[in-house]
């Protein structure tokens, strides 16, 4: 752990800028497991670790989610195309280099990759590698390393664009201004950034280990869950922009109890291991939170969010604790001392940060 700020590296799973809403003059309260709460600086609780590299998808897993997509979106070519685009990048070139795809399949995959995901220079490099593969030439390992690196850089570039837009929207929401959410691109950026963080935490990685241990299956189900989430969050953004079924709702906390935040900052209120709904709850300050999900469920299963009392805030804080792995954070020591709030899924540092 480092107390020094390094602007080139991500800080933990909750960026320092996000945590700043819980800090007074750069200081906030943190609780590790069942230990006593302690005062720390924003940068004192940040881990210098990049979190934007997606897990690689093996060929068998790729084929599994492809079949899943074909069954799910049978007869809806536009939706299938959109879905496959999301799961294809950046694994397509690994499949090509392994000789796993036919030429026609490669053409389809190439057609799905757009400038939104990858630069022209990277595309040109990958095309040269592809040409070498099909001419029978051996592609040097160092070239493939460059391709792999470019894949990661492409994702980083995409996420940085989402991140930049996210901070603008977040600043507005913290002021109580929801007008940025009237713009479709802003909605997409906000949903994509926040829900992608949900997929990149130690808690989520632990799910893969659990599946493998309990069912003697590799991470196919874990990958499928990730892909379903990734599809749903894009669908959520598209539908929300049309103001029909889904919405992003700013929730105000006027009780005498603050929202806390954890190292897994966003939770699905449904709480099932393989959830059927996307009832995503994200505190953005001690006094404000965001709900992303179906309008109907906000009026039924999650109606308490529309009229919070101290008991419901306490319940939401406990959900944050349940999802957290190592640490929870609060603006006031009293919030952590007066209740049995603690991170509920403690894992050794070596397991959490070795991936």
Labelled PLM ranges:
Residues 2-355:
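Alpha-helical structural context detector biased toward long hydrophobic helices
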